[in-house]
Amino acid sequence: MKNIIFMGPPGAGKGTQAKILCARLSIPQISTGDILREAVKNQTPMGIEAKRYMDAGDLVPDSVVIGIIKDRIREADCKNGFLLDGFPRTVEQADALDALLKNEGKSIDKAINLEVPDGELLKRLLGRAEIEGRADDNEATIKNRLDNYNKKTLPLLDFYAAQKKLSQVNGVGTLEEVTSLIQRELV
């Protein structure tokens, strides 16, 4: 079984690499960002609540995100593993995830962190905003998201390193180069 976490700052390529890896491993990609954006688009109660935070570049409250994850990992397609993309983002969320998985008889096997310099991230995200028209990808919001990441998410590296589950991967390179580096860490 492969239960994998993809970590890295916004724009590091987590979503792109997750799609490739999930297809190769035949496991589902669980993207909290995609689930939240869909809820916002459909104006569900959770989506309306989440939108306020997302528009400001702030993290959506743990209670909302944990509930989403709990429901999702119980689905049949997660029986043989899953890849979490964009969660956990804080040590508190990681603790809650570990407790949730333990109750389900599961655990995280590997946490992969994609490392990309801030200047490259800003360039990628501004380019994505133009191509995809994502409202949450303007320069002020991007800088706030990177600041949030640096303050709240970076401590997760120590959390998973202490569990001997962390792999650091250079996220700068061609799609194929980065994919190859990630696959080496999963052997």
UniProtKB/Swiss-Prot annotation:
Consists of three domains, a large central CORE domain and two small peripheral domains, NMPbind and LID, which undergo movements during catalysis. The LID domain closes over the site of phosphoryl transfer upon ATP binding. Assembling and dissambling the active center during each catalytic cycle provides an effective means to prevent ATP hydrolysis. SUPFAM superfamilies: P-loop containing nucleoside triphosphate hydrolases. GO terms for biological process: AMP salvage. The keyword Chloroplast does not apply. Keywords: ATP-binding, Cytoplasm, Kinase, Nucleotide biosynthesis, Nucleotide-binding, Transferase. It catalyses: AMP + ATP = 2 ADP. CDD domains: ADK. Monomer. Its EC number is 2.7.4.3. GO terms for molecular function: adenylate kinase activity; ATP binding. Residues 31-60 are annotated as: NMP. Its main location: cytoplasm. Belongs to the adenylate kinase family. AMP binds at T32, R37, D58, L59, V60, G86, F87, P88, R89, Q93, R134, R145. This is Adenylate kinase. PANTHER family: NUCLEOTIDE KINASE. It is found in: Cytoplasm.
